[in-house]
């Protein structure tokens, strides 16, 4: 047989096995006996061993790599994998849908939702180029995940090649990897028989199995996957419906949950929630709630995102698993901002497969409202199936010697006064950086990956540096020397050099990361990014007023007040000045000369409808570059309304108020002039 004949035989076998895999793993409809499948598979293996020039990465034989990886490499997602905001009650769901409707151009409309079970597994992103699986990654931080390509290939229901003749140039497919309940129980039973470690729950089992350096271990675990969405997609027209996109994924060869449903409005969503809640225990996989997504992709794009979550989707969590135990003591922890948080110490109890011995009491308002005493028998719940909390007290079991929980007058760490403002539920230590607990938490935050990212500066080393009086302020970190570090327990010269190198590397940063690292109350990553976009340096931000700050997106009155207060404190400015003197720097944005004669300069502009030549974010960026202020709502202060096709209520309101209306053609002339 010549090369062409051999290649054709290999392709025929590959196509046959793909067909068998699809019917067996996706449709649950085996086409041939196992023996026949094994014969085909063996024949393909023999061909590829004899003629390795015809071995391709999409071959069914390549699902398991024989060489374990040394580490997981980072992989950037083309489109961010954002987490969902959670709702726990009917009122929260109604509020979520109301907020979404109010932000739409046509607010008086009945929304259609795609409803899906929320699997309790591990989210993954699979990238296909030209129809072939090229890499897969975990969610990671939403922007960058870990490369688990070899491990994903061990899941038989993941197609290595899309089942279409005209695939997208590139497509990201998102899914949830899980282990079915029955397989989980069987795996643990075998592990117990062999004296091996068992998993606490199916989610841990799935995550631990997928993140194995040796993919052969992943292959030995009963992993499965359901796909729930599409990320980036190039050179392919996708349907304008999430449900239709899920059907497209099925055509591509992916498994999609058969429990996906269409629902209309709040009542439709609640009906689905009750349906899945009743069915939860009968499902072959673990779920911890349901997910609602507005079905229209164009409406999704119109709503966009807030911080790290979409405005068009949310997770409706089921009531978490609850257990009963005794509260034996209360400790107080001090956080980065001085918040004194009560923590319940409990008689250990298993809740949802996890042994719980500590639980949050939130704050003293909650303690008073629930009438919690030391010695009480309490109900523990894993809130969101993650953070254990004390839900309530069983009063009839209260012992005679039960004691009230008292707010400490002094910080349990530094002895400073603990105060509680009249309008706040949280009590705070006033010790500031004098308080070792606050300094430690502040240093940990400052060094974290999303802030200054000082690799190697972990909590154990921070404890040593603070407890031994080596570091008193954040800036002291950048004056550490080799001898001091090398003499610390468990450090040595090599570790000390690595830390000094990491400190030096961290000096080159960005303004938004630096602002986030400072730990200003109420300012997270998103808020720091907004501030950095509007103020290029500390001096200009120091001069900002509360009123000015409140004009920025995502900066409300409380956050604005904390920003102004932070930069009004002399000791904060001293630390910042010292950090800058020690070499922390970031690229200065180039000054753009704005033509003040352009018609948008200094004007308030609102965008509505769909522009045929660019997306809304691009149009907004062009307007901002021209010195305009872009607003999300029409008012008497609006100067121009840029109206694309399908403009809705904003156009009506602008007409009523006499606001100048600009069509797309005129808008393009103005921005390009």
Curated annotation (Swiss-Prot):
The keyword DNA damage applies. Residues 595-673 form the BRCT domain. GO terms for biological process: DNA repair; DNA replication. NAD(+) binds at residues 34-38, 83-84, 116, 139, 176, 293, 317. Its cofactor is Mg(2+); Mn(2+). The active site is at residue 118. PROSITE patterns: BRCT, DNA_LIGASE_N1, DNA_LIGASE_N2. Keywords: DNA damage, DNA repair, DNA replication, Ligase, Magnesium, Manganese, Metal-binding, NAD, Zinc. GO terms for cellular component: cytosol. Its EC number is 6.5.1.2. InterPro entries: BRCT_dom, BRCT_dom_sf, DisA/LigA_HHH, DNA_ligase, DNA_ligase_AS, DNA_ligase_CS, DNAligase_adenylation, DNAligase_N. Zn(2+) binds at residues 411, 414, 429, 435. It catalyses: NAD(+) + (deoxyribonucleotide)n-3'-hydroxyl + 5'-phospho-(deoxyribonucleotide)m = (deoxyribonucleotide)n+m + AMP + beta-nicotinamide D-nucleotide. It comes from the Bacteria. Gene3D superfamilies: 5' to 3' exonuclease, C-terminal subdomain, 6.20.10.30, BRCT domain, DNA ligase/mRNA capping enzyme, Helix hairpin bin, Nucleic acid-binding proteins. One of its GO terms (molecular function) is DNA ligase (NAD+) activity. SMART domains: BRCT, HhH1, LIGANc. SUPFAM superfamilies: BRCT domain, DNA ligase/mRNA capping enzyme, catalytic domain, Nucleic acid-binding proteins, RuvA domain 2-like. Belongs to the NAD-dependent DNA ligase family. LigA subfamily. DNA ligase that catalyzes the formation of phosphodiester linkages between 5'-phosphoryl and 3'-hydroxyl groups in double-stranded DNA using NAD as a coenzyme and as the energy source for the reaction. It is essential for DNA replication and repair of damaged DNA. PANTHER family: CHROMOSOME TRANSMISSION FIDELITY FACTOR 18, DNA LIGASE. HAMAP family: DNA_ligase_A (MF_01588). NCBIfam families: dnlj, PRK07956.1. This is DNA ligase. It comes from Legionella pneumophila (strain Corby).
């Amino acid at each position: 047989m010549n090369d062409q004949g051999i290649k054709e035989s290999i392709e025929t076998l590959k196509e046959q096995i793909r067909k068998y895999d699809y019917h067996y793993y996706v449709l649950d409809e085996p086409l041939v006996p196992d023996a026949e499948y094994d014969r085909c598979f063996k024949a393909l293996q023999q061909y590829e061993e004899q003629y390795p020039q015809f071995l391709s990465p999409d071959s069914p034989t390549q699902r398991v790599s024989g060489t374990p990886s040394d580490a997981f490499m980072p992989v950037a997602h083309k489109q961010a994998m954002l987490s969902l905001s959670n709702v726990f009650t009917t009122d929260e769901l109604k509020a979520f849908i109301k907020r979404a409707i109010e932000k739409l151009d046509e607010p008086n409309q009945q929304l259609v939702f795609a409803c899906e079970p929320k699997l309790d597994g591990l989210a993954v992103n699979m990238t296909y180029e030209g129809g072939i699986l090229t890499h897969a990654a975990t969610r990671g931080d939403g922007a960058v995940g870990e490369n688990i390509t070899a491990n994903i290939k061990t899941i038989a229901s993941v197609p290595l090649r899309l089942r279409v003749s005209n695939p997208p140039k590139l497509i990201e497919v998102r899914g949830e990897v899980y282990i079915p309940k029955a397989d989980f129980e069987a795996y643990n039973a075998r592990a117990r028989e062999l004296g091996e470690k068992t998993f606490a729950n199916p989610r841990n089992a799935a995550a631990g199995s997928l993140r194995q350096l040796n993919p052969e271990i992943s292959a030995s675990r009963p992993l499965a996957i359901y796909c729930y969405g599409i990320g980036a997609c190039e050179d392919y027209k996708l349907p304008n419906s999430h449900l239709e996109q899920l059907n497209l994924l099925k055509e591509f060869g992916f498994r999609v949950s058969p429990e996906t449903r269409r629902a209309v409005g709040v009542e439709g969503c609640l009906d689905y929630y009750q349906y899945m809640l009743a069915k939860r225990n009968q499902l072959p996989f673990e779920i911890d709630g349901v997910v609602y997504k507005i079905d229209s992709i164009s409406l999704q794009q119109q709503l966009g995102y807030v911080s790290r979550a979409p405005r068009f989707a949310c997770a409706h969590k089921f009531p978490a698993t609850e257990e009963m135990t005794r509260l034996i003591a209360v400790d107080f922890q001090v956080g980065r901002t001085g918040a004194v948080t009560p923590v319940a110490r409990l008689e250990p109890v298993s809740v949802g497969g996890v042994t719980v011995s500590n639980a949050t009491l939130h704050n003293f308002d909650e303690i008073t409202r629930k009438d919690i005493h030391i010695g009480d028998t309490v109900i523990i719940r894993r809130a969101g199936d993650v953070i254990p909390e004390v839900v309530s007290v069983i009063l009839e079991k209260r012992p005679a010697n039960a004691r009230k929980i008292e707010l400490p007058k002094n910080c349990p760490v530094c002895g400073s006064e603990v105060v509680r403002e009249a309008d706040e539920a949280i009590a705070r230590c006033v010790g500031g950086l004098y308080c070792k607990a606050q300094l430690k938490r502040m240093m940990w935050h400052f060094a974290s990956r999303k802030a200054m990212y000082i690799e190697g500066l972990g909590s154990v080393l921070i404890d040593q540096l603070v407890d031994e009086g080596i570091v008193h302020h954040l800036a002291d970190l950048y004056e550490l020397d080799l001898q001091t570090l090398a003499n610390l327990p468990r450090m040595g010269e090599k570790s000390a050099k690595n830390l000094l190198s990491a400190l030096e590397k961290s000096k080159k940063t960005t303004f938004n990361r630096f602002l986030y690292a400072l730990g200003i109350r109420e300012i997270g990553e998103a808020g720091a990014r907004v501030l950095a976009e509007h103020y290029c340096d500390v001096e200009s931000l120091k001069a900002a007023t509360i009123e000015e700050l409140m004009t920025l997106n995502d900066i409300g009155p409380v956050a604005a007040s904390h920003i102004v207060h932070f930069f009004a404190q002399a000791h904060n400015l001293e630390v910042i000045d010292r950090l800058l003197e020690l070499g922390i720097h970031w690229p200065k944005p180039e000054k753009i000369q704005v033509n003040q004669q352009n018609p948008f300069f200094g004007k308030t502009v609102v965008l509505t409808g769909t522009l045929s030549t660019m997306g809304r974010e691009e149009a907004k960026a062009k307007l901002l570059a021209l010195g305009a202020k872009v607003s999300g709502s029409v008012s008497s202060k609006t100067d121009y309304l840029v109206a694309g096709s399908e403009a809705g209520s904003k156009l009506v309101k602008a007409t009523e108020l006499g606001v100048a209306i600009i069509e797309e053609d005129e808008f393009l002339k103005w921005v390009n002039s």
